[in-house]
Amino acid sequence: MTEKLGILAIGHGSKLPYNKEVVTQIANYIAQKHSDVVVRAGFMENSEPTLEEAIEGFSGTGVTKISAVPVFLASGVHITKDIPEILSLDKEGCGILEIDGKEVPLCYAKPLGADELIAELVFKRVQESL
């Protein structure tokens, strides 16, 4: 069986539309660069789709495994407690989703964290501000 990866990009959500736009655009960039991957964005609060709705968005896509990646810089309560509970993850950060009547394994990625790519982006923003 051929593997088909799904990516669930998880955003915090906000009453302001810009937060949703940023996370959705990041998901779109991933999808454009990796056309063989199914990418969906979902949000914790104040934005739609919710995580549950985003997971439903994998229906009919044929994904065989999903990576849930929080589009957050650092860990906090949402990362360590809320998202794992919503996704029914075990202590290793893995779980099973039912999509189209099939069990699909789910793995939970780390937040963005401290990374040279983030540092370069910060420096780019500094240069743009000058």
From Swiss-Prot:
Disulfide bonds: none annotated. It catalyses: Co-sirohydrochlorin + 2 H(+) = sirohydrochlorin + Co(2+); Ni-sirohydrochlorin + 2 H(+) = sirohydrochlorin + Ni(2+). Co(2+) binds at residues 12, 78. Its EC number is 4.99.1.3, 4.99.1.11. Keywords: Cobalamin biosynthesis, Cobalt, Lyase, Metal-binding, Methanogenesis, Nickel. Pathway: Cofactor biosynthesis; adenosylcobalamin biosynthesis; cob(II)yrinate a,c-diamide from sirohydrochlorin (anaerobic route): step 1/10. One of its GO terms (biological process) is methanogenesis. It comes from the Archaea. SUPFAM superfamilies: Chelatase. GO terms for molecular function: cobalt ion binding; nickel cation binding; sirohydrochlorin cobaltochelatase activity. The active site is at 12 (proton acceptor). Gene3D superfamilies: 3.40.50.1400. Homotetramer; dimer of dimers. Belongs to the CbiX family. CbiXS subfamily. HAMAP family: CbiX. Catalyzes the insertion of Co(2+) into sirohydrochlorin as part of the anaerobic pathway to cobalamin biosynthesis. Involved in the biosynthesis of the unique nickel-containing tetrapyrrole coenzyme F430, the prosthetic group of methyl-coenzyme M reductase (MCR), which plays a key role in methanogenesis and anaerobic methane oxidation. Catalyzes the insertion of Ni(2+) into sirohydrochlorin to yield Ni-sirohydrochlorin. PANTHER family: SIROHYDROCHLORIN FERROCHELATASE, CHLOROPLASTIC (PTHR33542:SF3). This is Sirohydrochlorin cobaltochelatase. It comes from Methanosarcina mazei (strain ATCC BAA-159 / DSM 3647 / Goe1 / Go1 / JCM 11833 / OCM 88).
